[in-house]
């Protein structure tokens, strides 16, 4: 910890730097031994702002989801009840930003919803239209009362469509500044047992100290929805109920869903061990499910079964793993259970990430570390044990669906 004292931090700045400061291009960065690139960062905005909202721009938030290495961040400053100024950057898009038809804009809708157009977002694009800036001076808006209420309920989002992703390649939900943002994508694939539901949805989770606030929505559930809950458990397993989630129709409102976490629950959340589950009349155990995960560039899910082996294995064993990818770094979490014999640690460690398409066998990319359960026929992939760097060729293969876990 430390303090930044005024007498030790007084600087003269040039006119160009002053202009950059006014455009919100100045930020403070705190470096640490574990995070040499920076562990804490803060963008400078005028002190008169009554509130600051942030949107992490990602294809994960788009509806439907867009899988790419594109990223971005936007901020919205609020002055009084009506004035909003938006700024930020984005990059690494696969195709140019749409600037005429589906131009960048601010839309109304909770996470997981597609909503109506509110304001155009003016961008200054780089070469090829694959990156750009959202300049503060070009994005000043006056909110009416309804728009202001939407903002504070997490009901406004930024959407950037591209030539190849006309519905949206990058999307970010505006939410109040928080210590940590997390994301959950709802799918029947993540349910235990897996569901063939066409339902989908998204959850935005904000963590401040021990207060967890969630918001979002779900769509196209096959049955009549039952009681939504937050549970304890890794991907691929089920666990105890923690909190009742209040829903209004298909919406999850932030003001109705703020929870105080115990120290154990906080540790579990950071370890990817808390999930949202929505049972229905069609799937009483859960029609769609979402694991709460730290913000990442992309997420990949691997459902583990004997049927997926190149030579099918008839087994009741089941499991699931989720891989988070950001800037060449991956984290794998999940679980498996029901093996019909003991886990074979002597098989070069027993669990690995391989490089090959479905139906074929490939080379080992990375050993996965397993914490075995009682009896050695079940186990978990803990986040702290399965964090590793990826070579560029392996990243390309991953995004091409060319990797599997065995």
Label each residue range with its predicted role.
Residues 1-228, 232-351, 355-406:
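Metal-centered catalytic cores of metalloenzymes
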């Amino acid at each position: 910890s430390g303090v930044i004292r005024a007498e030790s931090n007084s600087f003269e700045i040039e006119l160009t730097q002053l202009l950059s400061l006014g455009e919100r291009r100045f930020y403070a960065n705190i470096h640490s031994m574990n995070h040499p690139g920076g562990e804490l960062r803060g963008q400078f905005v005028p002190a008169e702002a009554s509130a600051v909202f942030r949107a992490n721009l990602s294809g994960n938030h788009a509806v439907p989801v867009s899988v790419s290495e594109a990223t971005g961040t936007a901020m919205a400053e609020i002055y009084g009840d009506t004035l909003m100024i938006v700024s930020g950057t984005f990059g690494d898009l696969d195709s140019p930003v749409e600037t005429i038809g589906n131009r960048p804009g601010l839309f109304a809708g909770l996470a997981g919803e597609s909503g109506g157009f509110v304001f155009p977002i003016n961008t200054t694009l780089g070469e090829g239209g694959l990156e750009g800036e959202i300049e503060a001076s070009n994005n000043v808006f006056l909110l009416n009362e309804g728009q202001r209420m939407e903002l504070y309920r997490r009901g406004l989002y930024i959407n950037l469509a591209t030539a190849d992703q006309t519905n949206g390649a990058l999307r970010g939900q505006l939410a109040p500044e928080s210590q940590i943002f997390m994301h959950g994508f709802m799918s029947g694939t993540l349910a235990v047992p897996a569901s063939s539901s066409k339902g989908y949805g998204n959850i935005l989770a904000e963590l401040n100290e021990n207060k967890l606030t969630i918001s979002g929505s779900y769509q196209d559930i096959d049955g009549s929805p039952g009681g939504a809950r937050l549970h304890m458990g890794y991907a691929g397993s089920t666990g105890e109920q923690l909190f009742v989630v209040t829903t209004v129709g298909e919406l999850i409102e932030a003001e109705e869903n703020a929870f105080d976490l115990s120290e154990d629950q906080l540790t579990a959340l950071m370890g990817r061990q808390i999930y949202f589950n929505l049972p229905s009349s069609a799937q009483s155990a859960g029609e769609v499910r979402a694991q709460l995960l730290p913000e990442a560039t992309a997420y990949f899910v691997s459902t583990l079964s004997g049927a997926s082996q190149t030579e099918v294995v008839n087994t009741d064993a089941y499991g699931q793993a989720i891989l988070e990818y950001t800037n060449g770094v991956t984290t794998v979490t999940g679980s498996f259970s029901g093996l019909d014999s003991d886990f074979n640690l002597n098989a070069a460690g027993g669990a690995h990430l391989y490089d090959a398409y479905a139906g074929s066998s490939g080379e080992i990319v990375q050993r996965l570390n397993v914490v075995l359960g009682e009896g050695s026929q079940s186990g978990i992939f803990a986040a702290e044990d399965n964090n590793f760097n990826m070579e560029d060729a392996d990243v390309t293969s991953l995004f091409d669906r060319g990797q599997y876990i065995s």
